[in-house]
Amino acid sequence: MIANGTGIAPFLGMLDFKDTEKHLYCGFRHQTEATNNFTNIARNQINTSLKIGYSRSEMPKYVMDLVNEDELIFVDILQNNGVIMICGSLRMQKDIETTLSKICEKNKLNSIDFYKKEGKILTDCY
């Protein structure tokens, strides 16, 4: 699951599924009480990993940076019939799709369009 800003909302309910391994990557401008609440919710779930980037912090980090850092997790997801869900801004979606395309090419996977057609990369962006 990849989100920025309010795009995290749909994923919060999905965190309750205990039987499925989940990876949540999210980006916000600043660390706030709300982002701390999201962090606490995610960290208290079983089978859930969490990575957060803050784009306006002293050491800015964007969601695409987090995805790049965990390239092999995304390769594993795509190779093993997993699903990548993206929710948030259209700009973030474009950046993430570019990042995933590079990961697919580098690791000799199918194209991102293939995974989208197969329902393995899902987007709900605005």
Language model features with spans:
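Active-site beta-strand/loop microenvironment that shapes enzyme catalytic pockets
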Residues: 1-18
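Reductase modules of NAD(P)H-dependent flavoproteins
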Residues: 20-126
